[in-house]
Amino acid sequence: MRVGYFQFAPVFGEVSRNLDTIVAALDRADADLMVLPELCASGYQFLSQQEVLALSEPVPDGPTTQRLIDLAKRRQMVIVAGLPERAGAVCYNSAVVVGPSGFIGCYRKTHLFFEETLFFAPGDTGFQVWDIGLAKIGVMICFDWYYPEAARTLALKGAEIICHPSNLVLPDCP
């Protein structure tokens, strides 16, 4: 199995531009599984609830997830990507898992960092594991790594690969 990641600096608020960057990079990627950054569609560091509401989308029916599904189908790969999710009036810092067969799942970040608590609700999905055929994968997002139980829970549930979309903003982050 070939696993890759594409770490880049998403431009805040420029969803179409960020998705164009992702598509161009993944069109050249030779991988079965690709992991993209936390909030890669919207960019990071929201300053207001209005920004979050304007940039968040429903999952799986929103335009970002749908475009990623199209890319995954065309490239025959699984993609894990971060985006701001809106479920009714509640917003989450989420990561979608999509593949050649379409939408696989969504993880909502459990451990919010600093000002994320002003704009996002703590995740309610729990730590999940998905069988993508070549491996069983789990997802945790950025600050979740700070809590060892996140990775431990995924391992105990059978994750062979832990995908970790991140937008590390602290100077001591690995």
Task: Tell where the protein language model's regions lie, with residue ranges.
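Extreme N-terminal starter segment of soluble prokaryotic enzymes
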Residues: 1-5
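N-terminal phosphate-binding loop and adjacent alpha-helix
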Residues: 7-25
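Residue-level recognition of beta-strand->loop/alpha-helix junctions
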Residues: 7-9, 37, 45, 108
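A conditional alpha-helix N-cap/helix-loop micro-motif detector
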Residues: 15-19, 61, 143
